[in-house]
Swiss-Prot record:
Protein species of origin: Shigella flexneri
GO CC terms: cytoplasm
Name by which UniProt lists this protein: HTH-type transcriptional activator RhaR
InterPro entries named among the record's database cross-references: AraC-bd, Homeodomain-like_sf, HTH_AraC, HTH_AraC-typ_CS, RhaR_RhaS-like_N, RmlC-like_jellyroll, RmlC_Cupin_sf, Tscrpt_act_RhaR
GO BP: any one term: rhamnose metabolic process
Swiss-Prot/TrEMBL keywords: Activator, Cytoplasm, DNA-binding, Repeat, Rhamnose metabolism, Transcription, Transcription regulation
Region forming the signal peptide: none
């Protein structure tokens, strides 16, 4: 068995007193599966890629938010102008009297829901705080670590305020059409999605929305929906005993033959080959 790559805090933190730092990925390249001896928050700003977290694949794009525990294993593949930031932290070094465990999913163990979404409002506010945090955590002046931790606490609370599950925006949300579209697509795993109907409901131009989506994500709307469905199929093939025909239906494909064609084109192997190969990991 190949040796598991592990990223070490000594390579990312300026001292053993530093609790928080920011690691930019402009852009994020393909990165082999790895773990850490620190934790991280991952926020995606634009582009797209495949993020595999604890053997579960996610097609990620702008607004995706992940809480990664040190023991989690993850990797990045099939990246396309993927821009993200990692806010890395050492739980045992945090001194601020905050309910970190209540505020950060999986703070003390690899558990809880790791994947969330941020809309444009939350992203804008988070970007501002992260900019301050990045500046403060790189300073070699008195109280820089304390200031960085205060900003990290502010960021954590801000994310709590603005995050939502990938397929469910709050009903009172003031997020942009693009945020609402991505949420609607995530909620359309099993059912057909009609862009013209969505645009009618939102009173917006289909052409403009298509352009906006591609500009921010690097994909067409159909490509994104297809890849989200394939990611879900990969997860079900590995972690369930459903028949391939049933998985096809669960992932929004009315015809299992067409599902097999799409799956093979996206992954390079048939659903049955993929299931056989990945069942050996469990």
């Amino acid at each position: 068995m190949a040796h598991q790559l592990k990223l070490l805090k000594d390579d990312f933190f300026a001292s053993d007193q530093q609790a928080v730092a920011v690691a930019d990925r402009y852009p994020q390249d393909v990165f082999a599966e790895h773990t850490h001896d620190f934790c991280e928050l991952v926020i995606v700003w634009r582009g797209n890629g495949l993020h595999v977290l604890n053997d579960r694949p996610y097609r990620i794009t702008r607004g995706d938010l992940f809480y990664i525990h040190a023991d989690d294993k993850h990797s990045y593949a099939s990246v396309n102008d993927l821009v993200l930031q990692n806010i890395i932290y050492c739980p045992e070094r945090l001194k601020l009297n905050l309910d970190w465990q209540g505020a950060i999913p999986g703070f003390s163990a690899s558990a809880g829901q790791p994947h969330w979404r941020l809309g444009s409002v939350g992203m804008a506010q988070a970007r501002q705080v992260i900019g301050q945090l990045e500046h403060e955590s790189s300073q070699h002046v008195p109280f820089a670590n304390e200031m960085a931790e205060l900003l990290f606490g502010q960021l954590v609370m801000l994310l709590n305020r603005h995050r939502y599950t990938s397929d469910s925006l709050p009903p009172t949300s003031s997020e942009t059409l693009l945020d609402k579209l991505i949420t609607r697509l995530a909620a359309s795993l099993k059912s057909p999605f009609a862009l013209d109907k969505f645009c009618d409901e939102a009173s917006c131009s289909e052409r403009v929305l298509r352009q906006q989506f591609r500009q921010q994500t690097g994909m067409t709307i159909n490509q994104y929906l297809r890849q989200v469905r394939v990611c879900h199929a990969q997860y079900l093939l590995q972690h369930s005993r459903l028949l391939i025909s049933d998985i096809s239906t669960e992932c929004g494909f009315e015809d299992s033959n067409y599902f097999s064609v799409v799956f093979t084109r996206e992954t390079g192997m048939t659903p049955s080959q993929w299931r056989h190969l990945n069942s050996q990991k469990d």
